[in-house]
């Protein structure tokens, strides 16, 4: 019976991929650049702001893209050089030939972009999954990361049982819960994700007015880009099978700014306190009225904290 229902759902809600060229034309711009990694991955990145300024590399979260940082690029770019990138399975990078979408692939992608733009050292920051990619990269390449900015960051897997609360799990994006279910992953590659995207964005952005039709369309069309849905499932499987051993974040002595929205429905604000305990050189800023994507919900206030942090380095 379950198999019949899965087949019926796949047929009724089926939606084919969008051509990559069509999506790329809409969501690239004059600042967009592409590099080809040794593993064949074509990585989309942008190098903006002040050419001679302190370099700041920013990494987006799950289901997002480098576009999430554009409000900060506009502000930080007045003083700093700001590099943003699309991770594998996301944005205009999308599916990669190797089919590798785990934490190590993210580390390699960040490293490749940093090398491509000629950075020896840089400030590294990330939101949500990109925050996890940030501290993982710093653990592997501590000599390259001069400071970190963690924005509602994914914590180590071994913390999650301590930091999750039932209310946030109920009110967060439904798609994240469904992607943990094997039955859903079996059909998700063919389903039209439109209803889940709308609900997920409203939850993640704390019902912010920045969730416009254009923003919903961008998320939808980037996810529907040829091969990306299958790549997202590959990323989900990679993280489901990830090593859950406890990393020693105390070795990360770089100055670190932790920013959190207290209304985060994806990763509860209690995780900010856990980072504050684990990291030896940390400053924490909590925004009581913001959610999981504070850099888009209120770019001016959040970027001001980043500028203050960077000025003190």
Where does each model-flagged region fall?
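Acidic catalytic loop of the alpha/beta-hydrolase fold
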Residues: 263-267
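Flexible "cap/lid" loop of the alpha/beta hydrolase fold
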Residues: 139, 149-185
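Short beta-strand/loop motif that positions the catalytic acidic residue
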Residues: 252, 258-260
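Active-site loop/oxyanion-hole signature of alpha/beta-hydrolase fold enzymes
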Residues: 36-40, 46-50, 87-125, 129, ...
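Catalytic active-site module of serine/aspartate enzymes centered on a nucleophile-bearing elbow/loop
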Residues: 282-313
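Alpha/beta-hydrolase fold catalytic core
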Residues: 1-54, 79-80, 119-120, 311-313
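Conserved alpha/beta-hydrolase catalytic His-Asp/Glu region
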Residues: 23, 160-165, 185-251
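Conserved HGGG/HGGXW glycine-rich cap/lid loop of the alpha/beta-hydrolase fold
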Residues: 48-92
């Amino acid at each position: 019976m379950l198999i019949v229902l899965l087949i019926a759902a796949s047929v009724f809600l089926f939606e084919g991929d969008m051509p990559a060229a069509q999506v790329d034309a809409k969501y690239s711009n004059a600042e967009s650049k592409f590099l080809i990694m040794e593993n064949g991955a074509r990585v989309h990145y942008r190098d903006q702001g002040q050419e001679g300024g302190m370099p700041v590399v920013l990494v987006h979260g799950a289901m997002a893209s480098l576009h999430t940082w554009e409000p900060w690029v506009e502000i930080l770019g007045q003083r700093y050089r700001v590099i943003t990138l699309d991770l594998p399975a996301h944005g205009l990078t999308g599916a990669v030939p190797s089919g590798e979408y785990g934490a190590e692939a993210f580390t390699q992608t960040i490293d490749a972009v940093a090398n491509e733009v000629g950075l020896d050292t840089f400030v590294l920051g990330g939101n949500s999954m990109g925050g996890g990619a940030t501290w993982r990269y710093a653990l592997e390449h501590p000599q390259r990361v001069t400071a970190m900015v963690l924005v509602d960051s994914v914590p180590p897997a071994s913390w999650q049982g301590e930091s999750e609360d039932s209310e946030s799990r109920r009110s967060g994006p439904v798609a994240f819960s469904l992607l943990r279910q094997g039955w859903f992953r079996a059909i998700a590659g063919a389903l039209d994700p439109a209803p889940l995207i709308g609900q997920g964005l409203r939850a993640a952005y704390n019902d912010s007015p920045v969730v416009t039709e254009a923003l919903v369309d961008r998320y939808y069309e980037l996810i529907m880009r040829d091969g990306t849905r299958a790549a997202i499932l590959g990323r989900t499987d990679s993280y489901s099978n990830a090593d859950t051993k406890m990393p020693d974040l105390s070795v990360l002595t770089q100055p670190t700014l932790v920013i959190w929205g207290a209304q985060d429905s994806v990763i509860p604000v209690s995780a900010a306190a856990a980072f504050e305990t684990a990291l030896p050189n940390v400053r924490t800023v909590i925004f009581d009225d913001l959610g999981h994507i504070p850099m888009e919900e209120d770019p001016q206030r959040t970027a001001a904290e980043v500028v203050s942090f960077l000025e003190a380095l």
